[in-house]
């Protein structure tokens, strides 16, 4: 069975040439083929997570499209705003996966609010609630090594999708052919039709205001003379974190230059992870 799936992918006119190259390189290597095609990534309350690459057991545009079609089928039964919020982090192909998800949703007549630049998970949760969306999608693999990416789904409350909702989405995913089953529209067409819009400045400002309103002693940082060293760990925190720090009065900030800007390879860590609770990325 998995050999048949492999041959189908190999003979298909895939949009991503890197996937075709990978499939050609593993031709005749049964273990490599089996690892990619014997099972599929399973969608659960935490969404999907897997190694980047070709096949149903890898993260690629076809797995993302299939998952999004399953999510779209569920959203269409929910009434409400018929809108989904999307964000993404600095991982490899995160922006590509986010745009593909937006294109599937738009093709299903579902409106999309997508960030125009990478933003972290809390920003996605906030946008989901701000726009009263039916769901949110975050392209991220959290603390996993650089070779991973993932697809997290959130409910209208901005929290992780419930077991019941995730089960329905998973059932819809299983009904969707991975290569041809997802509805698609170009990103540009989605913009032109008003189905895809970027998250507005009003939402971003509301996010920062909500964070700053949580201060236990407002104003104390302005006179505390604090000096901070901050590392975004090559992730998505640089813009929102420094914005909030400046807003609350902390201006003496030293940013670790090697980890300042987004880089999905997490190059400064010898094991290529961005997990702040482990010593390797910050040593």
Give residue ranges: language-model regions.
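Short, glycine-/Ser/Thr-/acidic-enriched flexible segments
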Residues: 48-50, 55-57, 91, 119, ...
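N-terminal small/polar loop signature for handling phosphorylated ligands or for N-terminal nucleophile
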Residues: 85-148, 244-270, 274
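Polybasic, low-complexity association/targeting segments
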Residues: 1-4
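Gly/Ser/Thr-enriched, mixed-charge loops and adjacent short helices
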Residues: 32-37, 41, 149-270, 274
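Single conserved hydrophobic/aromatic residue that forms the stacking wall/gate
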Residues: 271-275, 279-283
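Short, cationic motifs built from Arg/Lys/His that form the positively charged side of catalytic pockets
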Residues: 49, 91, 152, 277-278
């Amino acid at each position: 069975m998995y050999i048949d799936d492999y041959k189908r992918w190999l003979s298909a006119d895939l949009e991503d040439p890197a996937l075709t190259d990978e499939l050609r390189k593993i031709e005749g290597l049964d273990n490599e083929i089996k690892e990619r095609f014997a099972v599929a990534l399973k969608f659960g309350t935490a969404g999907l997570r897997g190694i980047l690459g070709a096949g149903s057991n890898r993260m690629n545009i076809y797995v993302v499209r299939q998952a999004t079609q399953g999510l779209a089928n569920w959203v269409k039964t929910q009434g409400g705003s018929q809108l989904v919020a999307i964000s993404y982090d600095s991982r490899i192909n995160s922006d590509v996966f986010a745009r593909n998800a937006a294109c599937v949703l738009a093709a299903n007549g579902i409106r999309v609010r997508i960030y125009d630049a990478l933003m972290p998970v809390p920003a996605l949760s906030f946008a989901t609630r701000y726009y009263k969306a039916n769901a949110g999608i975050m392209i991220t693999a959290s603390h996993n090594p650089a070779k991973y990416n993932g697809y997290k789904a959130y409910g209208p409350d901005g929290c992780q999708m419930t077991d019941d909702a995730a089960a329905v989405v998973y059932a819809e995913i299983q009904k969707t052919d991975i290569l041809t089953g997802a509805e698609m529209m170009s990103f540009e067409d989605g913009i032109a039709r008003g189905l895809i819009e970027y998250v507005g400045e009003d939402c971003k400002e509301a996010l920062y205001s909500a964070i700053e309103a949580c201060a236990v002693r407002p104003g104390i940082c302005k006179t505390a003379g604090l000096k901070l060293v901050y590392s975004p760990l090559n992730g998505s925190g640089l813009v929102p974190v420094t914005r909030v720090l400046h807003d609350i009065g902390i201006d003496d900030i030293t940013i670790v230059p090697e980890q300042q800007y987004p880089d999905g390879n997490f190059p400064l860590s010898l094991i290529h992870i961005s997990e702040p609770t482990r010593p390797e990325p910050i040593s």
